[in-house]
Amino acid sequence: MSAYCGKYKDELIKNAAYIGTPGKGILAADESTGTIGKRLSSINVENVEENRRALRELLFCCPGALQYISGVILFEETLYQKTKDGKPFVDVLKEGGVLPGIKVDKGTIEVVGTDKETTTQGHDDLGKRCAKYYEAGARFAKWRAVLKIGPNEPSQLAIDLNAQGLARYAIICQENGLVPIVEPEILVDGPHDIDRCAYVTETVLAACYKALNEHHVLLEGTLLKPNMVTPGSDSKKVTPEVIAEYTVRTLQRTVPAAVPAVLFLSGGQSEEEATRNLNAMNKLSTKKPWSLSFSFGRALQASTLKAWAGKVENLEKARAAFLARCKANSEATLGTYKGDAAADTESLHVKDYKY
């Protein structure tokens, strides 16, 4: 197979490897205006641009936090926002050794003839947008495909459509200098057990890598953002060690060694659960040719939001909470987390979650 070997090849490989640096991970701060509005309303803060900007400044300018972060996924609005002192967020991140990334999908639409299964849209002007984002300083991108587990789901049609969609997105990104994060999220919603989740995740990942190869995507210049293999939200919980064994086995069976890093989504787990599960994976002594890290949104921000509550006087307390989560997850990428960081243990699960 001839993989992409255009002018950005070396840069893509270097940036993908950097994002996967052990001890670091991704902060997902790419919530849409509607989604961040729900977060802000949970702390009684109005969803206006200044409040959204203030929250992002709280996170990006938190002293000491960026040493644990290799990339931040931004929403388009944030790519062009500045600190209150007028410094572009992109410059703040770069100076902190963090690569800016950008969410490029345009949400999901229902696949006709299925039971509410979806595919992701946004390919039409993707090349043009990627070139513009690269110019603005972005160096990687994210595209979320969403699948669900049901009696007959995911259907082969939904799997194929989403795998092909991710592959088309990935090669367009690479042609424009952006490392594509491939995110086939299998929602945790439902009563299924962990074996069913493992089977579906293997099937979906196998389809994704087949499609990526068919589109001549340079795997060394990509990253994978999958769900952890867990029981459904309405099923009996299992230990982090069991989740680690199932998840790593699933990756071993499906993800090529050429991929530099796997950065898990938290999928509505509590802050503490997400960190403990990641830590358990990195403690496993088995074949792991990729680094295993995090690309967390809610699981990095929940306790920070609660501490901040939109008040200037709470800034220090909120930053301390954010720094603690960044450090805890950094330790989890090394398998050294001891569970001593203040964390929110409340489930962050939202049924049929939309970004």
Swiss-Prot record:
Cellular component, GO annotation: cytosol
Active-site annotation: 183, 225
GO molecular function: fructose-bisphosphate aldolase activity
Bridged cysteine pairs (disulfide): none
Residue sites binding substrate per the record: 52, 142
Keyword Zinc in record: no
Catalytic reactions of this protein: beta-D-fructose 1,6-bisphosphate = D-glyceraldehyde 3-phosphate + dihydroxyacetone phosphate
Keywords, in A-Z order: Cytoplasm, Glycolysis, Lyase, Schiff base
E.C. code: 4.1.2.13
CDD domains membership: FBP_aldolase_I_a (cd00948)
Lyase recorded as keyword: yes
Site (Necessary for preference for fructose 1,6-bisphosphate over fructose 1-phosphate): 355
Biological process per Gene Ontology, one example term: fructose 1,6-bisphosphate metabolic process
Superkingdom, natural source: Eukaryota
Subcellular location as annotated: Cytoplasm
Enzyme class: lyase
Signal peptide: none
Pathway membership: Carbohydrate degradation; glycolysis; D-glyceraldehyde 3-phosphate and glycerone phosphate from D-glucose: step 4/4
Similarity comment text for this entry: Belongs to the class I fructose-bisphosphate aldolase family.
Listed name of the protein: Fructose-bisphosphate aldolase, cytoplasmic isozyme
Organism: Zea mays (Maize)
